[in-house]
């Protein structure tokens, strides 16, 4: 079983590496094509291979390129089968972290919560794979305040690491009543860059396909690389107006890393993207939107 998993993982990484090489080659061809069409100078770094690239352009067509990619491998059952989400915490969780994990369980339809106990990460991931879990969520804390969220897609990855801030739990708001467990409609706003679409896919595939008459709405709104999570239900007051009611919890997410492996492969998996906060231009740059 372990050898089979290792082989499947190697095959997936090989496909991913080939796709990345093909994408880079296609970008170089596109730069040469645009320079020729617009009668501009060819970029300096491409001048040595410009003739070879121009020759290969003759054989390019719309064809089937780009129809499938590694995202299709990772989320091939998205929309066909409902995701199976497992939520757990770091070791020795405080009462507030347990409370937050319970509230996250209400956010994701069909999710299950598992007490961490003294289980190691490798044992957790193996148990999740054996039981058909598609996503493992781990919540971390600092002195009773939730500060981190890890989303690991199974069986091959990716794994996204987020910082949590400005957390307001349902338990902190009086007289909220019971939360709806209907399959929610999703609003994804501000994810216009390539990395933004990647993060949008990681988050939206945690939810099943909603029914048309669902009154529940979950929003992930990106602004300056901070993703605001909001949870509402709505009702129609008349044929023109809709009344929104926030049911919580609410928090902000800040992405700081995406790894290509699962959670237990932290030491060996390749890093797809990492935030570098200590560079001179870090405070000026945004990554999740193209604006």
UniProtKB/Swiss-Prot annotation:
GO terms for biological process: ribosomal small subunit biogenesis; rRNA processing. Pfam families: Brix (PF04427). Its main location: nucleus. One of its GO terms (molecular function) is snoRNA binding. Keywords: Nucleus, Ribonucleoprotein, Ribosome biogenesis, rRNA processing. Residues 83-264 form the Brix domain. InterPro entries: Brix, IMP4/RPF1. The keyword Nucleus applies. Gene3D superfamilies: Probable brix-domain ribosomal biogenesis protein. One of its GO terms (cellular component) is Mpp10 complex. SUPFAM superfamilies: Class II aaRS ABD-related. It is found in: Nucleus, Nucleolus. It comes from the Eukaryota. The keyword Ribonucleoprotein applies. Part of the small subunit (SSU) processome, composed of more than 70 proteins and the RNA chaperone small nucleolar RNA (snoRNA) U3. Component of a heterotrimeric complex containing IMP3, IMP4 and MPHOSPH10. Interacts with MPHOSPH10. Component of the 60-80S U3 small nucleolar ribonucleoprotein (U3 snoRNP). Required for the early cleavages during pre-18S ribosomal RNA processing. Part of the small subunit (SSU) processome, first precursor of the small eukaryotic ribosomal subunit. During the assembly of the SSU processome in the nucleolus, many ribosome biogenesis factors, an RNA chaperone and ribosomal proteins associate with the nascent pre-rRNA and work in concert to generate RNA folding, modifications, rearrangements and cleavage as well as targeted degradation of pre-ribosomal RNA by the RNA exosome. This is U3 small nucleolar ribonucleoprotein protein IMP4. The gene is IMP4.
């Amino acid at each position: 079983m372990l050898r089979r998993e290792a082989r499947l993982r190697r095959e997936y990484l090989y496909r991913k590496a080939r796709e990345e090489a093909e994408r880079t080659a296609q970008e170089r061809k596109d730069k040469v094509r645009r320079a020729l069409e617009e009668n501009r100078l060819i970029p300096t770094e491409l001048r040595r291979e410009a003739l070879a690239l121009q020759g290969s352009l003759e054989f390019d067509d719309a064809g089937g390129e780009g129809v499938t990619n590694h995202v299709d491998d990772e989320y091939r059952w998205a929309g066909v089968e409902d995701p199976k989400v497992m939520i757990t915490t770091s070791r020795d969780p405080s009462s507030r972290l347990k409370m937050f994990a319970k509230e996250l369980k209400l956010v994701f339809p069909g999710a299950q919560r598992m007490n961490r106990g003294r289980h190691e990460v490798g044992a957790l991931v193996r148990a999740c794979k054996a039981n058909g879990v598609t996503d493992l969520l781990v919540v971390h804390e600092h002195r009773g305040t939730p500060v981190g969220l890890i989303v690991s897609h199974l069986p091959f990855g990716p794994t996204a690491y987020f910082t949590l801030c400005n957390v307001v739990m349902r338990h902190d708001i009086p007289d909220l009543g019971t939360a709806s467990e209907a399959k929610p409609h999703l609003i994804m706003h501000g994810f216009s860059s390539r990395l933004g679409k990647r993060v949008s896919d990681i988050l939206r595939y945690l939810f099943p396909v909603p029914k048309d008459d669902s009154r529940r709405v979950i929003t992930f709104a990106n602004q300056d690389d901070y993703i605001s999570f909001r949870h509402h239900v709505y009702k129609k007051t008349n044929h023109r107006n809709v009344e929104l009611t926030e049911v919580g919890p609410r928090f902000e997410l800040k992405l700081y890393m995406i790894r290509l492996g699962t959670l237990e492969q932290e030491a060996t998996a390749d890093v797809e993207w990492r935030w570098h906060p200590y560079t001179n231009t870090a405070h000026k740059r945004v990554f999740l939107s193209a604006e």
